[in-house]
């Protein structure tokens, strides 16, 4: 049996950008350009570039800049999502970040603001990331 313990997982970052608009919590989504799930709405995310990104936070900031045209707001590390079945390409881990930002920051095309209460099916485990970010924001609002 081959030794598979040294195989590297797919390493990515995903960013949950939340905002209040018309009294409802919204999340910023992008349409995926590549497989898997090409054409689906998803959280802004991408690979960690080992030779370019100093750390996962820098990777998240780069992804927001490149894919959404955003200068990184204050980003808080949310959680790490990992496993053999979260990505059809193979074993992967994603470091998720979140931020609560003013809606005017998210007026950049190609972002789509979607009410959290009306989210479509999302690829990977992006729904779990949104749920975790919403829980974090609600928890913080109770002691702020």
Question: Over which residues does each language-model region extend?
Answer:
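Active-site-adjacent beta-strand/loop module that shapes the phosphate/pyrophosphate-binding cleft
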Residues: 84-107, 133
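Short secondary-structure capping/junction motifs at helix and strand boundaries
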Residues: 71-78, 107
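Nudix hydrolase/Nudix homology domain
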Residues: 37-41, 101-144
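Short connector loops at helix/strand junctions that flank enzyme active sites
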Residues: 10, 72, 90-94
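Residue-level signal for short segments within beta-strands and strand-turn junctions
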Residues: 17-19, 31-32, 101
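Conserved N-terminal beta-strand and adjoining loop/helix that marks the start
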Residues: 2-27, 49
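Conserved Nudix-box catalytic region and its N-terminal flanking loop in Nudix hydrolases
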Residues: 24-72, 82, 144
């Amino acid at each position: 049996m081959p030794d598979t313990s040294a195989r590297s997982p797919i390493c990515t970052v995903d960013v949950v950008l939340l905002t209040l608009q018309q009294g409802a919590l919204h999340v910023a989504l992008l349409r995926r350009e590549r497989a898997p799930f090409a054409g689906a709405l998803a959280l802004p995310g991408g690979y960690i570039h080992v030779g370019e990104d100093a750390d996962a936070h820098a990777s998240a900031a780069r992804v927001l800049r490149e894919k959404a045209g955003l200068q990184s707001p204050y980003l808080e590390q949310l959680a790490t999502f990992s496993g053999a079945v979260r990505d059809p390409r193979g074993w992967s881990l994603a470091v998720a970040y979140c931020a609560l930002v003013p809606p005017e920051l998210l007026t950049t095309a190609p972002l789509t603001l979607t009410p959290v209460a009306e989210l479509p099916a999302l690829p990977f485990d992006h729904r779990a990331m949104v749920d975790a970010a919403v829980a974090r924001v609600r928890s913080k609002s109770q002691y702020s």
